[in-house]
From Swiss-Prot:
Name listed for the protein in its UniProt record: Peptide chain release factor 1
Protein family: Belongs to the prokaryotic/mitochondrial release factor family.
Localization annotation: Cytoplasm
TM ranges: none
Organism: Chlamydia caviae (strain ATCC VR-813 / DSM 19441 / 03DC25 / GPIC) (Chlamydophila caviae)
HAMAP family linked to this entry: Rel_fac_1
Xref: Gene3D superfamilies: 3.30.160.20, 3.30.70.1660, 6.10.140.1950
Annotated positions of the N5-methylglutamine modification: Q235
Gene name for this UniProt entry: prfA
Stated role: Peptide chain release factor 1 directs the termination of translation in response to the peptide chain termination codons UAG and UAA.
Length: 361
């Protein structure tokens, strides 16, 4: 890893020389490409500098521990060393992700659809918790977050929630969130203290780029209905027909949006979701045809595949696809997802490399 990092740091210096040359502005496409590369390599350098700094502190603490006699100081140093090791491990996971070569689709925006599954009200509440988790994660990454559609449950949380997230490396880091997320905890309404298990499903749909010619939707293939928006319990919240339902007749895909007061805005959001779903359906079809792609994936990305368990009583989160278990669920629910998303990106890349080596051997 060290050798690869040093190669990237050398490349960073080369990129900085190129983008500081005024002539680069004569080629906007090259400038855009170099700017993205510079941002990625700069982040790698920042994380690597943090690793070096943390490792120096760790080594200093170990040297101090070897000479320390005072029991209180020994206990303090041992605790600091344990925390330092955990931080270094976390930073290395982020580094591994940054060392994975970029994919042309890494920066595609995504639409995330969260739906309550088994568990009724508790599942709906967990959808709300995960919506907050992803919102906080988006904030820490500097991504733009917007609500596209939300169907609230009667006791709080959501039966369904659709959000749009845009920014650098959005698809790269969020694509492996697709699947079934299982939660184990004691509901607030549980008087016996029993742990209940419920689940939600998450779909991650990359939005087609504006110049993506593969997703063409003919207006003649659309059936558009308008109706009055309704809130929780079914009451009408608007006196005009602002809600929009769009049906794509060739595929049968149906999208409904009613969160905006403007019919025009609801239609625009519904079209975004529709395009993303149609693109996703086409990608799923291609992946099923390409066995090599399937075998190199981190899980199948299928909505029904159980990918992760959140156990609140143990403060534990486990990603079953890569055998990763962390005992910091409290931080994860506050949006600290980097250790998980980075590990998944790195694992997927190593699987792809291994699969390629097997084919060439």
């Amino acid at each position: 890893m060290e050798k690869k990092i040093l190669e990237y740091l050398k490349r960073l210096e080369e990129v900085e020389v190129k983008i500081s040359n005024p002539e680069i502005f004569e080629n906007p496409k090259e400038y855009s490409s170099l700017s993205k590369e510079h941002a990625r390599l700069s982040e790698l350098k920042n994380v690597y500098d943090k690793v070096l700094g943390q490792e120096k502190i760790l080594n200093d603490d170990k040297e101090a521990l070897a000479q320390e006699k005072d029991p209180e100081m020994i206990a303090m140093l041992e605790e600091g060393i344990q925390l330092g090791k955990a931080e270094v491990d976390k930073l290395y996971k982020v580094l591994e992700n940054l060392l994975v070569p970029p994919d042309p689709d890494d920066d595609l925006n995504v639409i995330m659809e969260l739906r309550a599954g088994t568990g009724g009200d508790e599942a709906a509440l967990f959808v709300g918790d995960c919506v907050r988790m992803y919102h906080l994660y988006a904030s820490t990454k500097g991504w733009k977050y917007e609500v596209l559609s939300a169907s609230e449950s009667d006791i709080g949380g959501y039966k369904e929630y659709v959000m749009g997230i845009s920014g650098a490396a959005v698809k790269r880091l969020l694509q492996y969130e697709a699947g079934t997320h299982r939660v184990q905890r004691v509901p607030e309404t549980e008087t016996q203290g029993r742990v209940h298990t419920s689940a939600i499903t998450v779909a991650v749909l990359p939005e087609p780029a504006e110049d993506d010619e593969e997703v063409f939707i003919d207006e003649k293939d659309l059936k558009i209905d308008t109706f009055r928006a309704s809130g929780a319990g079914g009451q009408h919240v608007n006196v005009t027909d602002s809600a929009v339902r769009i049906t794509h007749l060739p595929t049968g895909v149906v999208v409904t949006c009613q969160d905006e007061r403007s019919q025009h805005k609801n239609k625009a959001k519904a079209m975004r979701i529709l395009k993303a779903r149609i693109r996703d359906a086409e990608m799923q079809r291609r992946q099923k045809e390409a066995s090599a792609m399937r075998s190199a994936q981190v899980g199948s990305g299928d909505r029904s595949e159980r990918i992760r368990t959140y156990n609140f009583s143990q403060n534990r989160v486990t990603d079953h696809r890569i055998g990763l278990t962390l005992y910091n669920l409290d931080k994860v629910m506050e949006g600290d997802l980097d250790a998980i998303t980075s590990a998944l990106v790195s694992h997927a890349y190593h699987q792809l490399l291994q699969h390629g080596n097997e084919e060439n051997s």
